Amino acid sequence: MKIYLVGGAVRDALLGQPAGDRDWVVVGADQARMEAQGFKPVGKDFPVFLHPRSGEEYALARTERKSGRGYRGFVVDADPLVTLEEDLLRRDFTINAIARDEDTGEFFDPYNGARDLQARVLRHVGPAFVEDPVRVLRAARFMARLAPLGFTIAPETAALMREMAASGELDSLVPERVWQELRRALTCAQPSAFLRTLHDTDGLRAILPEIDALYGVPQRAQFHPEVDTGIHQEMVSDMAARIAPGDALVGFAALTHDLGKALTPPEQWPRHIMHEQRGVAPLQALCERLKVPQDYRQLAVIACREHLNVHRLPELRDRTVHELLVRCDAFRRPERIAQLALVCEADKRGRLGSEEAAYPQGAELKRLHAAASAINARDLAADGLQGPQIGEALTKARIAAITAARKTSA
């Protein structure tokens, strides 16, 4: 019985990056032997155990044979005779197929993952790559993390990803897994690499058609020197990752704020009048399909519908600013204002030549919200107002607070 550290922990250590969870593989053991040593079985689809002291996951070395469509269509063999090399062969990328002996610290790298780490190449291990459509998503997500380090996808790996897209294999991806990989990509330093990887290998159309439809749609160069809406979307996603690092909530709202531009009739290009309203329907469809959590949906819809209003904040009347805050449910969910401000800043700075531009609207929105929020309904009730009178007086007082706050900054 031999134990090896495998996967991301080994990869990240060799890259000099902070490692997350550690995964272990056990060669030469079966379930009875693992349980006899105090390991607790937890795996449903294949034999995984929790260490009795550390709680870390230990999996028996195994092989996988394709038996059906999709990422669940596999027959697993975890016989004690399965070798370390056979276990590493089933893994997705060479940089994830490196093992380190727990006792000696010796590395085992039968598929030249260390060489690819040094060359900054994401390469599949073997032809079985095409059997699991999740690997297309993982390739894109790894690029969102590794592209800032100079990684590229091996041409032969990109070719296999195109074959998988053409075969329809990506249609078998379950929504929860698509959302999981998308959400993780949005926490990475360069989410645009997730989009670009899928787009360049023909997978984005099957996985995120609402985003794919933005590529090739022109915008007015006066406001968008990058012109292509798809390129703008990539820039916005990267800017969101820069100003709100690790915040997938802000990242998702930034990613989806301009979906309505794909629905603009071509004869109206490059203008996109009312795109902020048209974008709500495809956004809601995307959220339904991927089973996106409610907090993500709600912020994304607000950002889609209101981002132009925030950009035009200095032009809005005081009453209109209050109406904007009400539509955002900002008096019950005050955190949304800071989140919306970040999304709108990412939109404004996610344009060619505007990357370092100031965005005073964000701070002003938060300041006006704070002024309006200082008005308390309980104080009005204490003055003897009742029922609808309180609501009317509260609105009037909050608008007055916005007016006063604007005068102090004038």
From Swiss-Prot:
InterPro entries: CCA_bact, HD_domain, NT_sf, PolA_pol_head_dom, PolyA_RNA-bd, tRNA_CCA-adding_enzyme. Belongs to the tRNA nucleotidyltransferase/poly(A) polymerase family. Bacterial CCA-adding enzyme type 1 subfamily. Transmembrane segments: none annotated. GO terms for molecular function: ATP binding; CCA tRNA nucleotidyltransferase activity; cyclic-nucleotide phosphodiesterase activity; magnesium ion binding; phosphatase activity; tRNA binding. Catalyzes the addition and repair of the essential 3'-terminal CCA sequence in tRNAs without using a nucleic acid template. Adds these three nucleotides in the order of C, C, and A to the tRNA nucleotide-73, using CTP and ATP as substrates and producing inorganic pyrophosphate. tRNA 3'-terminal CCA addition is required both for tRNA processing and repair. Also involved in tRNA surveillance by mediating tandem CCA addition to generate a CCACCA at the 3' terminus of unstable tRNAs. While stable tRNAs receive only 3'-terminal CCA, unstable tRNAs are marked with CCACCA and rapidly degraded. Residues 229-347 form the HD domain. Mg(2+) binds at residues 21, 23. Keywords: ATP-binding, Hydrolase, Magnesium, Metal-binding, Multifunctional enzyme, Nickel, Nucleotide-binding, Nucleotidyltransferase, RNA repair, RNA-binding, Transferase, tRNA processing. This is Multifunctional CCA protein. Monomer. Can also form homodimers and oligomers. NCBIfam families: PRK10885.1. ATP binds at residues 8, 11, 91, 138, 141. CTP binds at residues 8, 11, 91, 138, 141. Its cofactor is Mg(2+); Ni(2+). A single active site specifically recognizes both ATP and CTP and is responsible for their addition. PANTHER family: MULTIFUNCTIONAL CCA PROTEIN. Its EC number is 2.7.7.72, 3.1.3.-, 3.1.4.-. PROSITE patterns: HD. The lineage of its organism: Bacteria, Pseudomonadati, Pseudomonadota, Gammaproteobacteria, Lysobacterales. GO terms for biological process: RNA repair; tRNA 3'-terminal CCA addition. Comprises two domains: an N-terminal domain containing the nucleotidyltransferase activity and a C-terminal HD domain associated with both phosphodiesterase and phosphatase activities. HAMAP family: CCA_bact_type1 (MF_01261). It catalyses: a tRNA precursor + 2 CTP + ATP = a tRNA with a 3' CCA end + 3 diphosphate; a tRNA with a 3' CCA end + 2 CTP + ATP = a tRNA with a 3' CCACCA end + 3 diphosphate. CDD domains: NT_ClassII-CCAase. Magnesium is required for nucleotidyltransferase activity. Nickel for phosphatase activity.
